[in-house]
Amino acid sequence: MKKVEGMILMNHGIFTFHDDAKKSYQLMIKLVTKAERFIKKSIGSKKSSKSKSSPPKASDLSLIRKIVSEWRGCPVNSHFDNSDLACEFANLKNVTSVASRGPLTPDHVIRTKRIPLVIASDIKKSIDKYAVDYIKYFNKYSSNEMTMLDPAPRWAVLPGKGILTFGCNKKELTIVKDIVKHTIKTIIKTELAFGGWKALNASKLFEIEYWELEQAKLKKAESNSLPHKGKVAIVT
């Protein structure tokens, strides 16, 4: 039998193997490059719109931050992204559908939640519905001894305008921004190249989100949190 060089783990990613660490890394580069070339060839001349509409009003962004903070149980920082990449994603005709399929890789769920918030014309109604849907998701898949995490979104799509990310501090916000950037870039490519993609189902994602070892990562981060994080103070 030929020696196995790599393995595709469905709905997760790719692994490469070798007794030598450097050669294992080189195999990773080789296989990922092969995939990138295939995707590029499949996309061909297909393009999606990067046009930018007027940005959301500052008062709307402030309202979004306020309501998300209330559901989160702490003041959150928010970042609005209307870069070409963010607008290209927000302009997808089926953005609500593609954004609501799940994370690209399951372990992202502890940072980004299973799906983002998609904001419609009624801001409060959109955010409240997201939170209520999360509570239903928890009740559907949880067992009695589990404690629900907060139901607030970690990122949001403003159709036609851009992307919002949320975090209780700069570190969390940066992590979410980084994950979302790679997520939307990959979704755009898979939509253009293959006409779609599929995430792990909700029940499996719930198991990962509430898996003890994954929760330990968040608890460790929370133990180092500061008492006034996310707050603004005026010193006179």
Residue spans of the language-model regions?
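Structural motif
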Residues: 13-14, 162-163, 232
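Conserved N-terminal Rossmann-fold NAD(P)-binding element of oxidoreductases
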Residues: 229, 233-236
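Short beta-strand segments
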Residues: 8-11, 111, 157-159, 236
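Domain-length cofactor-binding catalytic modules of enzymes
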Residues: 26-226
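Functional cores that coordinate and move charged inorganic groups
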Residues: 1-40, 45
